[in-house]
Amino acid sequence: MTSLYTTLNLTMSIPVVAVALLAAWRLRGPERRRWLIGVGGALLILMILTAVFDNIMISAGLVAYDDSLTSGIRLGVAPIEDFAYAVAAAVFVPSVWALLTASPRVGAEVGSPTVSGRGDALLTRAPEPGDDDEVRTPERPGTPGLLTTLFWSSRPVSWVNTAAPFALAYFLATGGFDLVGVIGTIFFLVPYNLAMYGINDVFDYESDLRNPRKGGVEGSVLERSRHTATLVASAVTTVPFLVYLVLTGTVESSLWLAASAFAVIAYSAKGLRFKEIPFLDSLTSAFHFVSPAIVGWTIAGAELTGGVWACLIAFMLWGAASQAFGAVQDVRFDREADLKSVATVLGARAAVWFALACYVAAVVVLLAAAPWPASGAAFAILPYLATVAAYVGVTDADAERTNEGWKRFLVLNMLAGFCVTQIVLWSVLVWS
């Protein structure tokens, strides 16, 4: 029988494998060689460090593992499962960075068809007299298959950001994993993201055409002919999971699941468009990532105590801050498309300060109200604070330069997730 710790590692390795396969397919020539060298070097260093520090801490009695929760395979006295995090970090971080900095797979020259992305739903056009240089008009040539389009639209780099909150909350509440935990994790890993980002890509089509950063890992430009198929695929892949989670869950978890599904639709869908209501846009975006944790906790029948609420509120503040900072880079394009956001209303500089305030508030809530070791997650917020603080002088005119900081978030999210995962594992495997 597979141990609990091993099962958790295998579940959380799914997005790592997905991103690695994506990098292997996407990268070519020197870029692939640099990626392989980066992965190999990071893997060697992290494996050595993990072996050394795990053996030291376990031998010193600082950490102890219940043998019934591990496979029993050890390197020295360190359980083999501990090395999964070294492997995940060594593979995932270089892969994400390589994808962010990769050159377009299809070259473009003046007077030839141009390409809008790095492998997303590729949209091509031939330049015509009088064209607006910032608007890309899609045509059918070069359009990828439907599955490829859906894959990119689901933002595979962000899958773990919604699956991990559910999985960790469920694991923390139950101390284990069963079929409900696995099904829930799979739902929040892929179908949930396809619905969330797919709906967004359909209803943000016009503004995305004007946004040059769309078309890569930061977001796809979804060809109009794929809109109906994307909406249908979103419904078909999510409804069976929703039905299962309602039937196997509690009344409380079902209500939270319904709220989560509504927030996914309401954020982008025509007639609701919460993303165009300043401040509600930040809160709804944050709820997209907090709600899986609430569902994971309540579907296990666990109580939402004061300490749990403190963690969830801090998570909401964290997510709202990240959304507000992310909106800064799109200020000019959103205004041109007559779209409202917390950044277009406040202005770039004020939005950055708003993000900073939310991060600080999250730290305060964790340190003041969250129980140990959950309060230790406050330290995972500090790199975000440092990143955003570098842009406190930004103006609307140069707001797009915050994109560099936003790209760092893609890596910081993984590092923060790693820290939170360690806290949860230590809570269940050690302190309990």
UniProtKB/Swiss-Prot annotation:
Its catalytic activity? all-trans-lycopene + dimethylallyl diphosphate + H2O = dihydroisopentenyldehydrorhodopin + diphosphate; isopentenyldehydrorhodopin + dimethylallyl diphosphate + H2O = dihydrobisanhydrobacterioruberin + diphosphate
Cross-referenced InterPro entries, in alphabetical order?
Lycopene_cyclase_dom, Prenyltransferase_related, UbiA_prenyltransferase, UbiA_sf
**Quick check: keyword Transmembrane in the entry?**
yes
Spell out where the chain crosses the membrane: 4-24, 36-56, 83-103, 170-190, 252-272, 277-297, 299-319, 350-370, 374-394, 409-429
Region (Beta-cyclase) residue spans: 1-140
What species is given as this protein's source? Answer: Dietzia sp. (strain CQ4)
This protein's name = C(50) beta-cyclic carotenoids biosynthesis protein LbtBC
Bilayer disposition of the protein: Multi-pass membrane protein
Q: Which GO terms describe its biological process?
A: carotenoid biosynthetic process
Q: Which family does it belong to?
A: Belongs to the UbiA prenyltransferase family.
Q: Which UniProt keywords apply?
A: Carotenoid biosynthesis, Cell membrane, Isomerase, Membrane, Transferase, Transmembrane, Transmembrane helix
**Quick one: which pathway?**
Carotenoid biosynthesis
**What EC number(s) is this enzyme filed under?**
5.5.1.-, 2.5.1.150
Name the job this protein performs: Involved in the biosynthesis of C(50) beta-cyclic carotenoids. The enzyme acts at both ends of the substrate, and catalyzes the conversion of lycopene to the C(45) intermediate dihydroisopentenyldehydrorhodopin (DH-IDR) and the conversion of isopentenyldehydrorhodopin (IDR) to the C(50) carotenoid dihydrobisanhydrobacterioruberin (DH-BABR).
Cite the Pfam families for this sequence: Lycopene_cyc, UbiA
Q: Which gene encodes it?
A: lbtBC
Primary site of residence: membrane
UniProt-annotated location(s): Cell membrane
The segments labelled Disordered in the record are 111-140
Note whether RNA-binding occurs among the keywords: no
GO CC terms on record?
plasma membrane
- Renumbered to this chain, region (Elongase/hydratase) spans 141-432
Which GO MF term does the entry hold, naming one? transferase activity, transferring alkyl or aryl (other than methyl) groups
Q: How does it assemble?
A: May form a complex with LbtA.
